[in-house]
């Protein structure tokens, strides 16, 4: 009896996952989803306008998907009625990418325990800049005779991780500044936090207001400040109170910036991004179990591109348990330090702008979400990010008014 119960539960789970993926590919069109079948039984093909033939792996094994050209067979019924049979399992392939299943069969990780683009089949096959899942969606919609989504941004998120409020308001930062001979900067910061080079919140708020309708989120830490979580800042202290007041006055939202080492959620946090973009599948399930409903971590730290192979927010499917969770993944489009850091892409400003332009165009053409991450600590007079960020915001304005 128990075996029958668990089997029926698993079958129901699989049915929910398949239905969700089909509806996701059709941009939520439930009526059109009923015209799509996922079956290898030829006797059932006549029930559907489009049939996707399973590769037999979904819910059984995790295998590397076939990324060659999609093979479509056209069948004519009663002389003129046509149906299409897709012999490439785009349902499984979609599952593989949006669930992060590749990480279960590829053990490679960097020193921070992260799965990098260079380890992925996406990096190996130069497909990082191609949202394959959205291409499947467009193909399916064309076969069903549906209108393709109008180019647009379904939402723009301008996000900022507050790894540190100030450079010189904590002991190690102040001592380091003094040892480097930056006496004036240190004492100026001690007198007034607004003078600290990392206290760039007013500037960020002013820039972000250029994008009408954008949602602005600042992810804050509540950690012991040890190791890679250093430096600590006190959420009950007066320095953070200044930041919080600025953010509240600007109508920005506050999310939880998860510890490098994992940990509890700050209060009733709904929005989350992991520090160092470090979030394993088990950690992601912990987030779902703790009540986090929206995550903004999903990007490879070492290269920009579409880690989930979609430009759109998607509910996470746990590939270990084959369960459809309520945790929504918002694909991160661009992170500042990925562009400029020498251990990552190491681009100059013109090269970085070009790569961002390519990504923004892909998101716009697929009516996806655009999510930018710029740290308050990187917007200084050093480097090019204080120049690049406004240029990208201007590009967004131009794109939305085309």
Task: Please give the residue ranges for each predicted region.
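Terminal accessory/targeting
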Residues: 1-234, 312, 319, 323-402
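A subset of signal/propeptide-processing and intrinsically disordered low-complexity segments
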Residues: 156, 252, 290, 297-300, ...
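Metal-dependent polysaccharide deacetylase catalytic core of the NodB/CE4 family, i.e.
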Residues: 164-168, 202-283, 298, 304, ...
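Short, structured secondary-structure boundary patches
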Residues: 238-240, 268-270, 292, 313-321
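Short, conserved, surface-exposed binding loops centered on an aromatic residue
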Residues: 246-247, 285-286, 316-322
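Histidine/acidic-residue-rich catalytic or RNA/ligand-binding cores of hydrolases
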Residues: 264, 281-286, 306-311, 382-390
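His/Asp/Glu-enriched short active-site or ligand-binding loop at hydrolase and phosphoryl-transfer sites
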Residues: 291-318, 334-338
């Amino acid at each position: 009896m128990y075996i029958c119960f668990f089997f029926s539960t698993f079958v129901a789970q699989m049915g929910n996952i398949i239905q969700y993926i089909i509806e996701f590919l059709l941009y939520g069109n439930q009526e059109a989803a009923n015209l799509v079948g996922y079956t290898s039984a030829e006797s059932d093909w006549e029930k559907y306008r489009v049939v996707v033939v399973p590769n037999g792996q979904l819910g059984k094994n995790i295998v590397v998907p076939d990324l060659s050209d999609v093979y479509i067979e056209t069948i004519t019924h009663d002389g003129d009625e046509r149906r299409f049979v897709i012999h490439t399992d785009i349902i499984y392939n979609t599952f593989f990418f949006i669930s992060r299943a590749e990480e279960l069969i590829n053990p490679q990780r960097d020193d921070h325990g992260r799965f990098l683009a260079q380890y992925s089949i996406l990096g190996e096959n130069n497909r990082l800049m191609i949202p394959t899942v959205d291409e499947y969606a467009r193909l399916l919609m064309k076969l069903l005779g549906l209108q393709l989504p109008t180019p647009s941004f379904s939402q723009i998120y301008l996000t900022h991780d507050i790894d540190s409020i100030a450079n010189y308001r904590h002991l190690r930062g102040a001592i380091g500044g003094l040892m480097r001979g930056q006496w004036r900067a240190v004492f100026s910061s001690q007198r007034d936090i607004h003078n600290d080079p990392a206290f760039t919140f007013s500037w960020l708020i002013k820039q972000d207001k250029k994008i009408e309708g954008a949602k602005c989120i600042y992810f804050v830490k509540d950690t012991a400040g040890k190791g890679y979580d250093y430096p600590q800042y006190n959420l009950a202290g007066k320095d953070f109170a200044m930041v919080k007041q600025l953010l509240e006055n600007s109508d920005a939202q506050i999310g939880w910036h998860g510890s490098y080492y994992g940990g509890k959620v700050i209060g009733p946090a709904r929005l989350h991004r992991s520090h160092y973009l470090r979030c394993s599948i088990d950690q992601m399930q912990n987030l779902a179990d703790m009540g986090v409903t929206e995550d903004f971590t999903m990007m490879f730290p070492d290269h920009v591109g579409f880690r989930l192979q979609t430009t759109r927010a998607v509910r996470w499917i746990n590939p270990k348990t084959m369960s459809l969770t309520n945790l929504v993944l918002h694909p991160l489009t661009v992170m500042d330090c990925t562009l400029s850091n020498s251990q990552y892409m190491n681009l100059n400003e013109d090269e970085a702008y070009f790569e961002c332009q390519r990504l923004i165009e892909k998101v716009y053409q697929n009516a996806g979400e655009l999510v930018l991450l710029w740290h308050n600590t990187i917007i200084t007079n050093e480097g090019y990010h204080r120049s690049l960020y406004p240029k990208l915001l201007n590009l967004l304005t131009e794109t939305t008014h085309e």
